[in-house]
């Protein structure tokens, strides 16, 4: 039997506000335990929650970017459950009236473009966390994270592979960081993924029983967890068993999922409207203001890069993966006047070097103006592609040096003396009679071999196109 995996994601996006969603306590990461535990988060008697306006603004911004419906009336609900890191005994969330509904997000997997529908995004508060390390077998409670504003973004179960789920998560991560509503730091818990996974026979309309894998904080873990869970469910079904609805944890060391608890449904949480919070009404003026303040979105910018700079759709998607990358490209392309060549170098040599060095683009010793200068020297014929790579390496190692200084210091200028190049061509032709005969017999590969010999003789400084023209002229 052929099985199909069905995946839906619930992603917790931690909003980068300075204060918490219902109190003025700080959201700064890394403080001493409970240093930012406010009176609301501690559930002290008589304290009341006060809505953080900025949370609403950021939620609207995401809704607009997802081309979603923005609900004008927002009601908060209490989600009741007992856990030590939740002193109130309930979490303030949104059940029936989320701020964002019916959005969509485009993903790319290989050569395929697919649109995933976003069911909803609702505002809620984060819980605290339990601390087990260094307490001699006891458990401590840290409420610094409690009350931190979250947007829980829920997709439709429309992904059919771990690769599609990762592409969706990456696309949403890119979007929320682009909008500057989340810092995207997965290691610090700013972007956490819950994956709902089920399997069914290929062609069956009815969904299988889903299991939810909680708190995946890297794209690699997301992929591993989904693949393992899908295989585990298939094995259960093929052995004649039944998959039980459950909440799962992923063990990254073993690369496997395990049951944390049997899954609860919404009625288990006894939701009811929070009597301490008035509905949040979004006016026409507020919505129009939010629309006017929206930045150019990645998809729009990618289309502009294709139109204005002549880059491919693929390159444009890479260049708009982040605002930093897009701004770098646009600055370098404008300065050099060479959009396509700039894109090739950014997505090629520069990206590879950054990856090798474990660096971010913002920290690159080759700034946008320096890359523009390098690209300009390639475009005007001063540097061949081979010499340009050597120049790039030198520029990386010597961040203060100009491209002119690099070329002079390392002797990288391309040969322009036609007479000297012609003499090298004559010598190579004389010493490679076999290759010459092969080329005359129609073997195009022989031409590449001859060009290679001339380039070797010139130590890479001859212009390959010029060399090829000279060889063809002499052998015509």
UniProtKB/Swiss-Prot annotation:
Q: Which GO terms describe its biological process?
A: glutaminyl-tRNAGln biosynthesis via transamidation; translation
- InterPro entries referenced in this protein's UniProt entry, alphabetically: Asn/Gln-tRNA_amidoTrfase_suB/E, Asn/Gln-tRNA_Trfase_suB/E_cat, Asn/Gln_amidotransferase, Asn/Gln_tRNA_amidoTrase-B-like, GatB, GatB_C_1, GatB_Yqey_C_2, Gln-tRNA_amidoTrfase_suB_CS
The keyword Protein biosynthesis is assigned to this record: yes
Query: EC?
Result: 6.3.5.-
> What the protein does?
Allows the formation of correctly charged Asn-tRNA(Asn) or Gln-tRNA(Gln) through the transamidation of misacylated Asp-tRNA(Asn) or Glu-tRNA(Gln) in organisms which lack either or both of asparaginyl-tRNA or glutaminyl-tRNA synthetases. The reaction takes place in the presence of glutamine and ATP through an activated phospho-Asp-tRNA(Asn) or phospho-Glu-tRNA(Gln).
Q: Which PANTHER family match?
A: GLUTAMYL-TRNA GLN AMIDOTRANSFERASE SUBUNIT B MITOCHONDRIAL AND PROKARYOTIC PET112-RELATED, GLUTAMYL-TRNA(GLN) AMIDOTRANSFERASE SUBUNIT B, MITOCHONDRIAL
Which family would the database say this protein is a member of? Belongs to the GatB/GatE family. GatB subfamily.
What is the name attached to this protein's record? Aspartyl/glutamyl-tRNA(Asn/Gln) amidotransferase subunit B
From what organism does this protein derive? Neisseria meningitidis serogroup A / serotype 4A (strain DSM 15465 / Z2491)
């Amino acid at each position: 039997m052929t099985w199909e995996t069905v995946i839906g994601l619930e992603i917790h996006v931690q909003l980068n506000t300075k204060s918490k969603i219902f109190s003025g306590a700080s959201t700064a990461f890394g403080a001493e335990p409970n240093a930012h535990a406010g009176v609301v988060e501690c559930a002290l008697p008589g304290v009341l929650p006060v809505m953080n306006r900025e949370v609403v603004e950021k939620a609207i911004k995401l809704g607009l970017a997802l081309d979603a419906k923005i609900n004008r009336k927002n009601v908060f609900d209490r989600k009741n459950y007992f856990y030590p890191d939740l002193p109130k005994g309930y979490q303030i969330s949104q059940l029936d009236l989320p701020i964002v509904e019916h959005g969509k997000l485009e993903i790319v997997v290989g050569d395929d473009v697919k649109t995933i529908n976003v069911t909803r995004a609702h505002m809620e508060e984060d819980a605290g966390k339990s601390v087990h390390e260094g307490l001699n077998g006891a458990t401590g409670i840290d409420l610094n994270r409690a009350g931190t504003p979250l947007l829980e973004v829920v997709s439709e179960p429309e992904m059919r592979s771990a690769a599609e789920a990762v592409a969706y998560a990456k696309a949403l991560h890119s979007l929320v960081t682009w909008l500057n509503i989340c810092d995207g730091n997965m290691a610090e818990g700013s972007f956490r993924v819950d994956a709902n996974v089920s399997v069914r026979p290929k062609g069956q309309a009815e969904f299988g029983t889903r299991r939810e894998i909680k708190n995946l904080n890297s794209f690699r873990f997301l992929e591993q967890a989904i693949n393992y869970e899908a295989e585990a469910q298939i094995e259960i079904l093929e052995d004649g068993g039944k998959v039980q609805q459950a909440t799962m944890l992923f063990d990254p060391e073993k690369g496997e999922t395990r049951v944390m608890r049997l899954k609860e449904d919404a009625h288990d949480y006894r939701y009811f409207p929070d009597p301490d919070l008035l509905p949040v009404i979004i006016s026409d003026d507020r919505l129009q203001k939010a629309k006017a303040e929206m930045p150019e979105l990645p998809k729009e910018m990618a289309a502009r890069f294709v139109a204005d700079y002549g880059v491919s759709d693929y390159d444009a998607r890479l260049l708009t993966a982040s605002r930093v990358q897009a701004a770098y490209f646009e600055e370098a392309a404008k300065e050099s006047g060479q959009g396509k060549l700039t894109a090739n170098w950014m997505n090629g040599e520069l990206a590879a070097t950054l990856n090798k060095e474990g660096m971010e683009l913002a920290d690159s010793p080759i700034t946008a103006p320096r890359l523009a200068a390098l690209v300009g020297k390639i475009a005007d014929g001063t540097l061949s592609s081979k010499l340009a790579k050597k120049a790039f390496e030198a520029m990386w190692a010597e961040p203060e040096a100009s491209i002119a200084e690099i070329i002079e210091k390392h002797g990288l200028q391309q040969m322009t003396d036609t007479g000297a190049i012609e003499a090298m061509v004559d010598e190579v032709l004389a010493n490679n009679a076999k290759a010459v005969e092969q080329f005359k017999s129609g073997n195009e590969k022989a031409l590449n071999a001859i060009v290679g010999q001339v380039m070797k003789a010139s130590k890479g400084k001859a212009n390959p196109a010029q060399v090829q023209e000279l060889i063809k002229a002499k052998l015509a």
